[in-house]
A protein has these predicted regions:
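Short amphipathic alpha-helices and their capping/turn residues within compact interaction modules
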Residues: 31, 35-36, 143-146, 162
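Short, flexible loop/turn elements at secondary-structure junctions
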Residues: 81, 129-131, 142, 161-164
């Protein structure tokens, strides 16, 4: 099943193309362009979904939004509400997620440029529902641009995925596989036409172009 899904995903992007931005690429290129409304590569933009990721649980998001080919990750351009804490301390984002919530796994990691200057942050989160942690994970990328903050909202780029350590029968892995199968399922074969019902062509038909093997 996994190999079939990977093969189908390979056909969704141009040969050799892969969308899996590093933290530096996410906070210096992808996210700033999304915030500014500037175009991204036409093969990439359809896989960055503009939605409130914190309004739904990850299984619902997986069913509604297709993953990125070759990696199976899902990317979302969204915003999170910032809530000020005590004076002298940083702010934290409020991250509800439908009936559950996203919980940070440790402190945010600074993203720095080649000169060591901070240019953004990446926070690791894990989804918790019914008092138990699931195998849905998320990386939340934020940049230092002033345009990223609008009122009490912080605009971020999120990468949602299933933990590589998830068991084959985990709920998250099953939700992800079911959603991917629905999105990438090949079309049903057409019913064969009976020979006596197909009229003979008056002129020779051109042969169908052969699709190059991938």
């Amino acid at each position: 099943m996994e190999l079939e899904m990977a093969a189908l995903r390979e056909r969704m992007l141009p040969s050799g193309f892969r969308f899996n931005p590093t933290p530096q690429e996410a906070v210096t290129y992808t996210l700033p362009r999304l915030i500014a409304g500037e175009p991204l590569h036409p093969a990439v933009r359809p896989y960055i979904h503009d939605t409130d990721i914190y309004a739904c649980e990850p299984g619902v998001l997986a069913a509604q939004f297709q993953p990125t080919p070759r990696t199976g990750d899902r990317f979302f351009f969204t915003s999170c509400k910032r809530q000020p804490q005590k004076a002298g301390k940083s702010t934290r984002a409020v991250r509800a997620g439908g009936p559950g919530s996203w919980h940070s796994q440790g402190n945010s990691a600074d993203v720095k440029d080649g000169s060591g200057v901070k240019i953004g942050e990446v926070k690791k989160l894990r989804y918790k529902k019914g008092g138990k942690f699931t195998d849905w994970l998320m990386d939340e990328f934020s940049c230092c641009s002033e345009d990223a903050v609008v009122g009490d909202r912080q605009r971020v780029l999120c990468k949602m995925y299933v933990s590589p350590r998830a068991a084959p029968d985990s709920a998250a892995r099953q939700e992800d596989a079911a959603a991917a199968a629905a999105v990438f399922a090949p079309p049903a074969p057409e019913k064969p036409v009976a020979a006596h019902k197909r009229p003979a062509p008056s002129i020779a038909e051109q042969p169908c172009p052969q699709t190059a093997a991938t």
